[in-house]
Amino acid sequence: MRRMVMVWIWNPLIVNSTFDVGDDGICLKSGKDEDGRRRGRVCENVVVDGCTVFKGHGGFVVGSEMSGGVRNVSVSNCQFLGTDVGLRFKSKRGRGGVVENIWIRNIAMMDIPTEPITFNLYYGGKSAVEVLESGEKVPAKVEPLPVDETTPCFRNIHVKNLV
């Protein structure tokens, strides 16, 4: 039985857990678009250690619904086996929110069919494998938009010892 659990929680500790969900494995979110910015419920002070993710779109994922912000996250000593992407950061223009102070270290990845790490700030709702299989092309030129509160921001992301 496939089940996704979404909760509002602060200071979570996710340790020695196994995920096999067929979607994003360990996924941090904090609200969507204007409603997420208005509520301002930051997903923060997260510790993920010693977890294993089988299959799915991403092993560790932030977004795409991250308008309230995500900060102070430590991910270490995990295995991602057969996920489409290992580390996946996604959002889109108009969403807003700040993702910052993310530390990722000692991650083992096997049988990843696309990239070990992706940042997609024009996320359209499809996994990396779905985009590749569809033959869709990334537009050669994206219409520039002004930087404002609806512009997502990713900063201070540290990655070390990926194998």
Each model region followed by its residue ranges:
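Extracellular/periplasmic carbohydrate-active domains that bind, remodel
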Residues: 1-163
